[in-house]
């Protein structure tokens, strides 16, 4: 199981995604790729804060298309993930490497499901015990 981080999903929404990222995603088995409710929220928030207009409408449509491809493969931030979140955040705090925002929620979902995380921001997930795949540097 591989979870796509927000930056990977956002890249797939671009009119011309980075060729390496697109090739990497296409090389995976569709059933192995997941994303999270956190990523869905981040992407939708980014779209909804835009002024009304053509760009916002286009991005809504693109997001519907991309997330529609996941249907049953959007993992929730549930009670078990919340417990892992507490462990991740407190562990990083003790190590002097605080982690904030949505990243620890995504990391906790990955840990709960024993999933790797495809992301461009590998350093953001250091010391979370999540296997990280940098889709911008992977060669296919």
Features from the language model and the residues they span:
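Acidic, PIN/NYN-like endoribonuclease modules and their adjacent C-terminal/linker elements
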Residues: 1, 107, 111-140
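Active-site phosphate/pyrophosphate-handling residues
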Residues: 7, 20, 83, 105, ...
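Alpha-helix capping/helix-boundary segments
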Residues: 8, 39, 81, 106, ...
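Nucleotide phosphate-binding site architecture
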Residues: 9-10, 41-44, 126, 133
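Short, structured coil segments at secondary-structure junctions
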Residues: 29, 70, 128-129
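Active-site neighborhoods of divalent-metal-dependent phosphate/nucleic-acid chemistry enzymes
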Residues: 45-53, 69-118
């Amino acid at each position: 199981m591989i979870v796509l981080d927000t930056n990977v999903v956002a890249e797939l929404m671009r009119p011309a995604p980075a060729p390496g990222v697109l090739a990497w995603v296409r090389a995976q088995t569709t059933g192995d790729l997941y994303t999270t409710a956190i990523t869905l929220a981040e992407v939708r928030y980014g779209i909804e804060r835009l002024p009304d207009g053509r760009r916002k409408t286009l991005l809504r449509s693109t997001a519907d298309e991309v997330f529609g491809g996941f249907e049953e493969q959007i993992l929730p931030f549930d009670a078990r993930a919340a417990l892992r979140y507490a462990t991740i955040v407190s562990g990083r705090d003790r190590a002097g490497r605080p982690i904030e925002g949505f990243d620890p929620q995504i990391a906790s979902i990955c840990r709960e499901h024993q999933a790797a995380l495809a992301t461009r921001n590998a350093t953001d997930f250091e010391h979370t015990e999540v296997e990280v795949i940098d889709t911008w540097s992977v060669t296919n």
